[in-house]
């Protein structure tokens, strides 16, 4: 199966990272050490120019969403279409959710400030707002000033930057900003092909991070996770990720142009995936499956019409485009 549905960059981590993890296997009989945790925290802090107290290590960016319910917001506003995990977390905790649905082209500039519960804007009473940048599944990269415009007194803005390191230069990232009311969640899973290990981190004010992690058990991350976080945030690794992001951007441009040449609408974005509309998404997806190609269905995302599909940016994109062409003909 040629998998365009999952946004992990490669089938396995790079050799040097695998070697570092393998070298720690003999230590798995011991609990993770404080020095390993400190080394990982310091690597993240150094990368983003933050104080160590502003870093919380996570078992994947998704754990950050799972912990948000512990902040007990009165009303959580989710900028949609977006990653579905936050809604599931808040719903399970009985926390009211408001979907602030962005109309095409899915830019924050199209989000009006409103108070009505059934309107597309963000109610003033929302004391927690979640926004992706770049957003999954649209791939749209919002200007940082538009994200910061979501701030209000008494409100925490949570920015999902799971795909930020796939954007060349990370120009709109808030990871390096020390703001008391902005919490940034980052993932290392996609770029470093570590979906089976679960690694990420949160960046925010120490008080916010304390509340976020207050109910976690001891040793929430294992030795291999801590090693991976330290390794992936070292200067050489950051440079390698940046080079990979530049290559992905070229592939994305080529892939987008090819899909548009078929007469398809492709959303302008900067993520390592593309969102495009087809006349019949279910028919298209089933045809692609017969060709051994998987893409992501999008009818599960709030605010997104069912005729959209999402496909990861891969070197094999011509195979996908050829298969799509067969259906359109």
Predicted segments, located by residue:
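Conserved N-terminal alpha-helix of the aminotransferase class I/II PLP-enzyme fold
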Residues: 19-60, 251-252
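PLP-dependent aminotransferase class I/II
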Residues: 13-14, 38, 181-259, 264-267
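Conserved beta-loop-alpha segment that forms the PLP phosphate-binding cup at the N-terminus of a helix
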Residues: 37-40, 52-76, 84, 200
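Conserved PLP-anchoring active-site segment centered on the Schiff-base-forming lysine
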Residues: 69-91, 96-103
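Active-site phosphate-binding strand-loop segment of PLP-dependent enzymes
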Residues: 98, 102-168
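Conserved PLP-binding active-site segment of the aspartate aminotransferase-like
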Residues: 5, 275-280, 291-329
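Conserved PLP-binding catalytic core of the aspartate aminotransferase-like
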Residues: 248-249, 260-291
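N-terminal "arm"/small-domain region of PLP-dependent enzymes with the aminotransferase-like
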Residues: 1-32, 46, 116, 125
């Amino acid at each position: 199966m040629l998998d365009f549905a999952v946004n992990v960059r490669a089938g396995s981590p790079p050799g040097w990272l695998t070697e570092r993890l393998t070298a720690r296997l003999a230590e798995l009989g011991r609990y993770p050490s404080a020095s390993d945790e400190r080394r990982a925290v310091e690597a993240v802090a150094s990368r983003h120019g933050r104080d160590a107290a502003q870093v919380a290590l996570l078992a994947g960016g998704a754990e950050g969403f799972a912990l948000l319910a512990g902040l007990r917001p009165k009303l959580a506003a989710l900028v949609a279409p977006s990653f579905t995990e936050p809604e599931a977390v808040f719903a399970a905790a009985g926390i009211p959710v408001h979907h602030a649905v962005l109309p095409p082209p899915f830019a924050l500039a199209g989000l009006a400030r409103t108070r009505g519960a059934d309107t597309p804007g963000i109610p003033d009473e929302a004391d927690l707002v979640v926004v992706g940048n770049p957003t999954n599944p649209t791939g749209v990269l919002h200007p940082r000033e538009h994200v910061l415009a979501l701030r209000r007194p008494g409100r925490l803005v949570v920015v999902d930057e799971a795909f930020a390191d796939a954007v060349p230069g990370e120009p709109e990232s808030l990871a390096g900003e020390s703001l008391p009311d902005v919490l940034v969640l980052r993932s290392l899973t996609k770029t470093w092909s570590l979906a089976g290990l679960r690694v990420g981190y949160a960046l925010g004010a120490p008080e916010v991070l304390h509340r976020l992690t207050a109910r976690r058990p001891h040793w929430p991350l294992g030795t291999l996770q801590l090693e991976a976080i330290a390794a992936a945030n070292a200067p050489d690794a950051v440079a390698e990720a940046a080079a990979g992001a530049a290559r992905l951007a070229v592939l994305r441009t080529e892939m987008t142009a090819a899909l548009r040449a078929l007469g398809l609408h492709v959303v302008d974005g900067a993520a390592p995936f593309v969102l495009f509309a087809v006349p019949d998404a279910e028919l298209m997806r089933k045809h692609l499956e017969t060709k051994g190609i998987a893409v992501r269905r999008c009818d599960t995302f709030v605010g997104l019409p069912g005729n959209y599909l999402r496909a990861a940016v891969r070197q094999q994109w011509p195979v996908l485009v050829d298969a799509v062409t067969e259906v359109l003909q």
